[in-house]
Amino acid sequence: MIGLPLLLAACASTVPDLYTAPNAGFAAVSDQTSVAIGKRTAFAQTQAENEAIQREVRALVQGKTISADTAVQVALLNNKGLQASYADIGLSAATAWQEATPVNPVVSIGVLGIGAAELGAYRAIEGMIASNLLAAQTRQQRMALADVNFRAAQARAVDDTLALANQTRAAWINAVAAFETVSYLQRAKVTSDAGAELAQRLGETGALNKAGQAREFAFNAELAGQLAQARLNASRAKEELTRLMGLWGDDLSYFVPDALPAVPRNLRSVAGIEARALNNRVDLRVARLDLEAQAAAFGLTDRTRLVSDLELIAGIEAEREIEDGRKRTEASPQLELEFAIPIFDTGKARMRKAELSYLQAANVLAQKAVNIRSEARAAEAGYRATHRIAQHYRDVLVPLRATVEEEGLLSYNGMITSTFELISAARDRLGAELQAANAKRDFYLAEADLTAAIYGGGAGASASTATAALASAGDADH
């Protein structure tokens, strides 16, 4: 009886502040995000914090032409899906907090022989305190597993942050490129309208037959359809960017540039990209934590394989009786040990499940490392190739088409080249410029993919299963 309070006191311990703080674990997420992409993120939990973010977002977007960096910053502050991901960190911290808290003892009091007037209303009274010994024995293992899941939640939040940043940057690139395409097609349409009007006038004078007229009219009609489709694509691309930034209402009054920046002459350094990816990829860190969680779950399962419930019940019984005409109270201490007998369930099935879960996590980690190496190599190859292609269109094809048009204009002034030949040369130059714009878009998308290949958040990242380990172990403006 005297040892019971000592046992309960030994189980008690201080819960780490890391789990109990309102922003538990978020500082690590913010720091890692800043290192990877140089942007700030926030976890808003109060109305005042949300209002402060809204004011900052409005100042960044309303009536402004936003850059890619601004779009990414707005998304990291304002996307509610990302805020939900940050809440997972708090949930895992609360789980770890719960595991660090000792199980409450159960107190029971019973009164026997109620109504015995000669004994003062009752015959006996029992008081019992039950403490779960197995919970105390496995507490360190459960805390270790909960801590792994907490760190995995942090890593997943970083991965979600990088994924949103990469998606937003790609959406901005696509939106700007779409409006740039509209601009080129509008210029081509002006040239086409002139050709169609000339064909009509020549047809009226008999200088151009119906086949020639129809050819110019068909080209003009086809270009009108392409321009309408390009405008629709631009509207959709901007709407996707709006969704990722979490904007609505008055915040929609933002613009994107009319064209992407020129392709840089030199590429940034990508030396040792495989090693950099293996050192920095967040999804690989998540896979490692998955394996660590399964190892902790395996150890917990092993500790509880034969005895899954063990309780110590201690108490005292006070019984009244009348002897020689006098009431006498006799107190008797009691001690019980309660546990399940492993006759049918010997825990082998749970051990097998834990072993296979660990093997599964190990294979997932190994394959993830292979995939990351491949993604890094592919991203580097795409980055270099798209840069060469974009430079080819800009430095070779577009100047050649411009030369053809200039020479055609000189010939036209000398009455050697016909008007239709001059219009055709202008169309070809605009077509080359449109190809160059598309190649420029592909380069900037490849550059965004390169960052994702090094730090994470790209299409190759997959969701983690570490959170299941604890449960498995226990059971027209633009």
Q: Where are the model-predicted features located?
A:
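A glycine-/polar-enriched beta->alpha junction
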Residues: L77-A84, G90-P105, E118, G127-L145, ...
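Short segments within alpha-helical structural elements
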Residues: E222-D250, V398-A459
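Small/polar, glycine/serine/threonine/aspartate-rich low-complexity segments that form flexible
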Residues: Q54-K64, S108-T138, R142, F255-L267, ...
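Membrane-embedded beta-strand positions in outer-membrane beta-barrel channels/transporters
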Residues: V72, E126-M128, W172, E274, ...
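Periplasmic alpha-helical coiled-coil/stalk elements that build and connect Gram-negative outer-membrane
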Residues: T138-R139, V148, A155-R276, A379-G382, ...
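Alpha-helical heptad-repeat coiled-coil segments that mediate oligomerization/polymerization in large
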Residues: G206-N209, I372, A379, M415-T419
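Terminal intrinsically disordered/low-complexity segments used for targeting and assembly
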Residues: M1-V74, R231-R276, T451-H478
